[in-house]
Amino acid sequence: MKRVAFVFSSAPHGSAAGREGLDALLATSALTDDIGVFFVGDGVFQLLPEQRPGAVLARDYIATFKLLSLYDIDQCWLCADSARERGLDPATPWVVDVECLAPDALRARLHEFDVILRF
């Protein structure tokens, strides 16, 4: 089976990309066990706790990220530099357990996957 990576690089609630990526991620988990999830660039905002999407009339899909472990999706990485560039501490209590990596280490992990889907 091919190894599939999901890369979240867009901010939540401004577009449907994050929600669609999460839906695709959960659907793919029924087909393969070898899934990696990466949060880079503005995608690090996907994992911030205590978001209030209702204020912009958006659906709260962020809570669904907490279900990843129920789908046996436990390979999750976050770009530490992306977090810092956006004024976030990589040690933030994210909504998902992620391993914070430097860009080079993150890139090396990403190259281990056969298919890369970006949202």
Curated annotation (Swiss-Prot):
This is Protein TusC. The gene is tusC. Its main location: cytoplasm. Belongs to the DsrF/TusC family. Heterohexamer, formed by a dimer of trimers. The hexameric TusBCD complex contains 2 copies each of TusB, TusC and TusD. The TusBCD complex interacts with TusE. Keywords: Cytoplasm, tRNA processing. GO terms for biological process: tRNA processing. InterPro entries: DsrEFH-like, Sulphur_relay_DsrE/F-like, Sulphur_relay_TusC, Sulphur_relay_TusC/DsrF. One of its GO terms (cellular component) is cytoplasm. It is found in: Cytoplasm. Part of a sulfur-relay system required for 2-thiolation of 5-methylaminomethyl-2-thiouridine (mnm(5)s(2)U) at tRNA wobble positions.
